[in-house]
């Protein structure tokens, strides 16, 4: 998983979230994100009444191909060896990566400063706005030092 802000920036530049994710794909990702430990296909299928093992296995193949999940380990399920799976990024990192991909599509029409202004303008609590501005200022100072 991506650890710090610099790793996140590099990760988001290199990894594009596929546009063809379905509701089922997201269902399985959500199950994996909510789990404290890696899950087998049968554990994933049993955690949602609407999922069959065949659907889960098909989605797992797709998510593995897209590198959104990985095989964590080989474990016993009863007397049978099974693969256990875990996500390759956190739910927050996934959301940020999606946002980054969407922003790239509109960045010629909406500048970063306009976007930040709109986000700050949508917040009603002045204390939260002040805190956000302080965090943004620290980030900008960090970027200036790197230039």
Residue ranges: model-predicted function:
Residues 13, 17-24, 40, 74-96:
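Short, cationic-aromatic polyanion-contact patches
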Residues 28, 58-66:
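Basic amphipathic alpha-helical segments that dock to polyanions
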Residues 33-36:
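Short helix-capping/hinge SLiMs at alpha-helix to coil transitions
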Residues 64-76:
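A short, conserved structural fragment
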Residues 93-144:
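Amphipathic alpha-helical dimerization/coiled-coil segments
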